[in-house]
């Protein structure tokens, strides 16, 4: 395994700060102090606090999403993957919002926007994986209407999961029942 770069080491420390105190607590000076380096060293790797925030947010979602559900279980069908993904996403996003975005009113609007963008970028990656899982699920009916494609179903599923995750009490049981009855033989 390759040795971590100085940038990776700084990013790991930034991750620890954000995980413990929230993104609003992350600062170039604070990170420099935590790592016993000069502020200039941080700026050699991150052009601005916004770039540092973006990279730290990206690392959060990379670790959370890739570790928890970007790797389907062998033989896992599309529906089971979606159920597992929803449960994992619910926990991941709840933790991000409760811990990482606490005191987010202190974050400048641009940094909040960047953090949300990184979240959306990860969702696009997830959708691509869902399409692959759908296409490789031998249990899905082969006589589906032509407009019920892997891409259409995956985008629909992810949009609905995200909508539920934004609600007060996320619940995808109706979505999963509809998918089961539509995609699989009864």
Language model segments and positions:
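Generic hydrophobic, amphipathic alpha-helix propensity
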Residues: 3-15, 31, 52, 56-60, ...
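Helix-turn-helix
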Residues: 9, 17-51, 55
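Solvent-exposed, amphipathic alpha-helical segments
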Residues: 13-21, 63, 67, 71, ...
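Hydrophobic alpha-helical connector segments
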Residues: 55, 69-95, 150-153
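Phosphate/oxyanion-binding loops and surfaces in catalytic or ligand/nucleic-acid-binding neighborhoods
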Residues: 59, 63, 88-96, 160-163, ...
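Amphipathic alpha-helical segments used for helix-helix packing
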Residues: 80-117
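Amphipathic alpha-helical packing segments from all-alpha helical-bundle domains
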Residues: 92-95, 110-140, 147-155, 162
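C-terminal alpha-helix
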Residues: 133, 177-186
């Amino acid at each position: 395994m390759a040795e971590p770069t100085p940038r990776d080491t700084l990013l790991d420390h930034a991750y620890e700060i954000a995980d413990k105190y929230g993104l609003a607590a992350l600062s170039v000076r604070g990170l420099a102090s935590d790592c016993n380096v000069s502020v200039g060293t941080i700026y050699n790797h991150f052009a601005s606090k916004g770039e540092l925030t973006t990279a730290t947010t990206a690392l959060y979602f990379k670790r959370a999403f890739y570790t928890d559900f970007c790797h389907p279980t062998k033989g896992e069908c599309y529906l089971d993957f979606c159920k597992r993904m929803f449960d994992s996403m619910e926990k991941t996003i709840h933790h991000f919002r409760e811990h990482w975005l606490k005191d987010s009113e202190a974050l400048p609007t641009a940094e909040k926007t960047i953090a949300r963008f990184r979240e959306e970028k990860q969702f696009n990656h997830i959708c691509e994986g869902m399409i692959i899982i759908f296409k490789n699920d031998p249990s899905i009916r082969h006589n589906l209407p032509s407009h019920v494609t892997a891409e259409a179903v995956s985008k629909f599923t992810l949009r609905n999961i995200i909508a539920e995750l934004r609600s007060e009490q996320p619940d995808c049981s109706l979505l999963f029942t509809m998918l089961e009855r539509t995609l699989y033989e009864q």
